A protein has these predicted regions:
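Mixed-charge, Lys/Arg-rich low-complexity intrinsically disordered regions
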Residues: 1-28, 98
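Basic/aromatic-rich interaction segments and small domains that mediate binding to polyanionic partners
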Residues: 25-72
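Intrinsically disordered, low-complexity, charged/polar segments
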Residues: 57-98, 168
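Residue-level signal for glycine
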Residues: 72, 118-120, 153-158, 162
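Short aromatic-glycine-(Arg/Gly/Cys) micro-motifs in beta-strand/loop hairpins
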Residues: 98-121
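A short, charged, amphipathic alpha-helix used as a generic interaction element across diverse proteins
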Residues: 115-118, 123-149
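A cross-kingdom feature marking charged/low-complexity
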Residues: 159-178
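Non-Sec secretion/translocation targeting segments of pathogen effectors
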Residues: 177-190
């Protein structure tokens, strides 16, 4: 297994934010339960730039299990082009931090992230337009293609190589503006 180091990171140090990024943990920090060094950071008071706290909350890209670690055990954020395909597939299954509980909220969208060869893992349910935007932002740097579909499986958003190709930029800006004005009230992505 490849051992990631500081040279594999695009950002290192305490001056960077870790939330919604793939981070590399020091090999010394790994427990027997988590054999890979790559984790998706969901938050914690140690995830902020120049943090006051030390705790970071993570999801393993080896097995999908949630865990916590200390900020000092994080080497940095991995360069997106170095993220292995297996880790990309695992990342595609992570819902955004703060996503609505699917036991009490009806999902409105499904998100799919594709590798360059077209492979993907099962889609993830997304409960609101804000969850869609959060999912796209967290996947965009790492995935070849991200596709968002509505409940009828019609494509409502597509991102290719980090660029939104559907809807147009103008339509997306109008949608985001209306979302800000309504703050969670009934806007439909088309």
């Amino acid at each position: 297994m490849y051992v990631f180091n500081r040279g594999d990171c695009d950002q290192t140090g305490y001056g960077i934010g870790l939330k919604n990024k793939v981070v590399v943990l020091s090999q010394n920090a790994l427990s027997k339960e988590h054999f890979g060094q790559l984790f998706f950071c969901t938050g914690g008071n140690g995830a902020n730039p120049n943090p006051m706290g030390r705790t970071v909350f993570l999801i393993s890209l080896s097995d999908g299990e949630a865990c916590r670690s200390e900020r000092g055990e994080v080497i940095g954020t991995v360069k997106p082009e170095l993220l292995p395909e297996e880790a990309k597939l695992q990342l595609s299954q992570i819902r955004p931090a703060g996503a609505a509980d699917l036991h009490t909220h009806e999902p409105e969208y499904s998100g799919y992230s594709f590798l360059e060869d077209g492979r993907y893992a099962a889609g993830v349910w997304l409960g609101s337009p804000q969850e869609v935007m959060d999912y796209v932002e967290m996947q965009k740097p790492y995935q070849h293609r991200v596709l968002i579909c509505d409940r009828d499986d019609f494509a409502v958003m597509e991102v290719l190589k980090g660029q939104v190709i559907f809807p147009t930029e103008k339509e997306l800006e109008a949608f985001q503006k209306s979302m800000q004005e309504q703050k969670g009230g009934g806007m439909e992505m088309k």
